Amino acid sequence: IEHLKGTTEHYAYALTELHQQITPDPSKAVVTPLKTDAILALATSTMEHYSLRPSKIHGKAKATLFPTILSYMGFGGYLNPFTHEAQVNTLQPKLRIITTACHEIAHQWGIAAEDEANYFSIKATTVSDIVLVSYAGHLLAFQNLVNALYRTDADQAKAVMEKLPEGILENIREVRAFWEKYQNPFEEVFERSYDQYLKANQQQAGIKSYSLVVDLLVDDYINR
């Protein structure tokens, strides 16, 4: 748990520094004036310049035609199995669009495992020279880590959260509020179906594989 706490604090500190670079007001959430197409293009270029991109393999994210349906299903995006296009739910908060697009592009590269696609998305965005992109990546990493910390030691997780500027907390609440708005009785059915789909495609952890990115981030922190 000490490694998890240390990793969570590491990302909390980096997130706070990035927030200060974007806005001098600690109480303000980070917002972007960029339109959806520009955000998707930014995510695509972020992955294009990522050093771990497989040679001769490219990817591009595009907005799904069914964002409302995806929202009710609880999905931020998906890889179209027929066209191999990275489809992104563009109704979600813009910061999350960036990391979701990168996640789906990782699938285009051939990264099938959800935890590894999440990891590639976080690694590509956090090392970006564009502060907004780096903030989005650090925010996603932190949310995964602090959620894991809550499950193991709620008091320590709360202590980390209490040190964050109000603006970062507002960004976190924005994501939570978005998904809560679309909660419905059928969401659990969709999740169970997708869980079985993942298991049928050699991802034994099923839908829980999304959270396994925490292990990869902690390993990175230990071996940094």
Question: What is the role of each PLM region?
Answer:
Residues 1-7:
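Alpha-helical transmembrane signal-anchor/signal-peptide segments
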Residues 19-95:
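Auxiliary, metal-adjacent structural segments of Zn-dependent hydrolase domains
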Residues 99-118, 122-123:
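Active-site recognition of the HExxH zinc-binding catalytic motif
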Residues 167-224:
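Pan-zinc metallopeptidase signature
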